Regions:
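Recognizes extended acidic, P/S/T-rich segments that occur
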Residues: 390-423, 435-436, 441-442
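Residue-level signal for secondary-structure boundary sites
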Residues: 6, 83, 184, 385-387, ...
Length: 451
């Protein structure tokens, strides 16, 4: 996930250093820095690795991240096709053979810089709406050796892998992130994705990270604005929101991993896409749906999630609600923060060992009523030394387990749930949390019969 914290020049700055060292302190095993351009292109406030001028800043960022936490640190490198506010966008058929040679050279040089910076590896961005993904796409209809058949569509990405490996050697980690299901009309599915993964693994890729969608073909068109590839259905599938089930894209790593193993390849597969609970993450690993767990939004909400999971403090995790405010900020070219952070902080608060929030002696006095077909909850305020930041609301349906429904921020002690059906019974509970992410005790639950 990009941060849009870099300046227009693409250099590392203090905001970038603060953001990524915060992730490192949280205990991630592998920190993949946001996509940085391998070429000199106007890409807004995004990092670049397109010349040696960027090496000092990236080297410093790498060193700070290594000092801050135990995890490995690698950059994700990317090539963008051109787009304009008129709605025009460059497509793969407009690129000459010389252009393709230049793309291969740019990736090779950028990967060499990544090694010179002291990173632990490099990840090639071949996903979503960007150059290498557009060559892999089933919609790549070039009439030469770089389009049409799957073999031809793989030609440029495999040239990039070969060149990068030559530049970095075989003792430096090389990963690839690509789309396992384009989720667009006439796009490829996990069938092609499995074949792509096998070819990449045989070409010497050390791990494969899988995503979905994020394409220009179904993006919403707004007059006078450049296309943003995460506004259509494929964009929803790339970053599944609250209306999608947890692990909505897990069929992708499961099928691709199975194809790799059937081909006799042990290449690790990263599963990603709305994986926000330890139970789901453990299930993925134990049932061999993936070998590693990839997270973006969940870590943005709480960078200390890995540390809290290891310490058995999952109840203290500030859980992402998958409202995709972060995606909307990116779409509007604004710095990407999390709506769950304290206002004006600009960063996730540091976790502490302070005493958790407490209910008053007589408890939260949770009560409920109905209004215009909605359930209205109210409760008494909790107290905390650091100040209450908000409340988590949990709901269970038809006697089922309580699951996190929403977060109510600030001094409000009221929540209205309009997504209920008449004639059904729902069970609710609330829990306070403070500025440091500490969670108080959950209230006793109440049952509401919606009439």
């Amino acid at each position: 996930m990009v941060t849009r914290l870099s300046g227009e020049d693409g250099f590392v700055n203090d905001d970038i250093r603060v953001r990524y060292t915060r992730f490192s302190r949280g205990g991630v095993g592998l920190l993949v820095l946001e996509a940085m351009a391998v070429h000199s292109a106007k890409s807004g406030p995004l990092l670049r690795i397109s010349s040696d001028d960027f090496v000092p800043g990236l080297s410093d960022l790498r060193a700070r991240c290594h000092d801050a936490g135990p995890g490995k640190v690698i950059p994700q490198i990317i090539h963008f096709l051109k787009i304009s506010r008129s709605g025009w966008r460059q497509t793969v058929d407009l690129l000459s053979l010389d252009d393709l040679d230049a793309i291969v050279d740019a990736y090779g040089a950028a990967a060499a810089r990544a090694r010179a910076c002291g990173f632990d590896g490099v990840e090639l961005h071949m996903a979503h709406a960007y150059t290498l993904s557009s060559f892999l796409s089933a919609l790549n209809r070039r009439k030469d050796d770089y389009g049409g058949s799957l073999e031809n569509r793989l030609r440029l990405p495999l040239r990039v892998v070969e060149r990068v490996r030559r530049e970095i050697g075989h003792d430096f980690t090389l990963g690839v992130r690509f789309v396992g299901d384009e989720t667009i009309r006439n796009g490829y599915t996990t069938v092609d994705a499995s074949l792509i993964a096998v070819r990449l693994a045989r070409a010497g890729v050390d791990y494969i990270s899988l995503s979905a969608g994020g394409k220009f073909e179904d993006a919403r068109v707004i007059a006078g604005e450049p296309l943003y590839p995460y506004t259509g259905y494929s964009g929803d599938r790339c970053m599944p929101g609250s209306h999608y089930p947890d692990g909505a894209n897990l069929y992708i790593p499961k099928e691709v991993r199975a194809a790799l193993r059937a081909a006799g390849l042990s290449t690790p597969v990263i599963a990603a896409g709305k994986i926000g609970t330890m139970a789901l993450a453990e299930e993925i690993l134990q049932t061999e749906q993936g070998d590693l767990i990839g997270m973006a939004r969940a870590l943005l909400a709480d960078p200390d999630l890995p540390k809290k999971w290891r310490a058995g403090k999952e109840e203290q995790v500030v859980r992402c609600v998958y409202g995709n405010v972060c995606k909307s900020l990116d779409e509007n070219f604004r710095r990407v923060d999390c709506t769950l952070w304290p206002k004006k902080l600009g960063q996730a608060p540091e976790s502490t060992d302070e005493i958790a929030p407490r209910w008053a002696e007589n408890g939260p006095n949770l009560r409920a009523g109905t209004k215009s077909g909605a359930v209205v909850l109210q409760w008494d305020r909790a107290t905390d030394n650091e100040g209450i930041y908000g409340y988590q609301v949990f709901r269970g349906e038809q006697g089922g387990v309580l699951v996190h429904r929403a977060s109510v921020r600030g001094v409000s002690t009221r929540y209205e749930d309009a997504r209920v059906l008449g004639g059904e019974k729902y069970r609710y509970a609330v829990r306070p949390y403070d500025l440091a992410g500490n969670r108080g005790a959950m209230s006793e639950s109440i049952v509401v019969d919606v009439r």
